[in-house]
Amino acid sequence: LKFIHSIERKTYTNTAGEDFSYLAHESHGSKFNFVFFHATGFNAETYQIFFDKLINCFGNQVSIYALDQRGHGLSNAKSDHTQLKSWDIFIDDGKEFIDSIEGSVICSGHSMGSIVAAKISSLNPKKVSHLFMIEPVLYGPLESLKFRFMSMIKYNRGLSIADGAAKRRKEFPSLEDAVTSYTGRGAFTTWTKDWISNYLKGGTRSIESGIELSCSPEWEAATFRSSSMDTWRYLKQIKMKVKVVYGSIGSTFSLQARNSLFKLGSHWDSNYYKDASHFLPMEYPDSVIKDLESYLNN
């Protein structure tokens, strides 16, 4: 790809003095500021291929900002997994990050990241001009209520996705070993080696015996367990045109949620990928970018 080296890693310090790492492609005089939030357990660099394709599509019309969220990637902000009870901290971090960018922004994200993007869009409509959600973690109002009740009585401690994350292997002798270990397995079944390699480059640090995941299995599990189930009150406030793209296999966007969301108004538009999984941006990046392009042009 011709633009492959045009994304830089930068550091942003919040008002509490905590350092966050982020990726930026800043194009002078660009038409769009595209701000992207990654999924639970991942990091900004995971989506490098998607960003490269985005730059190839939009050229100097787009600037890209992708934050390593708290406890993820190469950010050094405080992340005590015993204190993580909701996704509010991710929303606060994202709001502050967006405020540091000049001009209005397009908010986007994958999975948890699209919920962070949606809540920020709801809270700051003057700053956010567009919202583009990819495979959101969104359940219907009744499903959400049930999950919140289960959380209150601590019944969701046995959440299988969180249990799986907590048991994830943390250390590897080398990046190559880690890529081999992940290729074709679990969540990474449909990913190419380049996607896996980018996930690991942006989400590991060197230790004496090789490398370790920078998003600890405990933090990842706590993030799953504290999943946001109060999203509907934010979504109802959103008045801008929104585009939601979602898959079918292992989708975190439930049928009940789809039925409820698209009844909120004609400003909620969508595209369904029947052959895609929850990892839609990894599987169909070009198509997702076409969706984004048509959404922004309309």
Pin down the residues of each PLM region.
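Flexible "cap/lid" loop of the alpha/beta hydrolase fold
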Residues: 131-171
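Active-site loop/oxyanion-hole signature of alpha/beta-hydrolase fold enzymes
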Residues: 63-108, 149, 290
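A short loop-to-beta-strand scaffold at the N-terminal edge of the catalytic core in hydrolase folds
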Residues: 15-26
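Conserved alpha/beta-hydrolase catalytic His-Asp/Glu region
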Residues: 166-225
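Conserved serine/cysteine hydrolase catalytic core
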Residues: 203-263
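Catalytic histidine-centered segment of alpha/beta-hydrolase-like enzymes
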Residues: 273-285
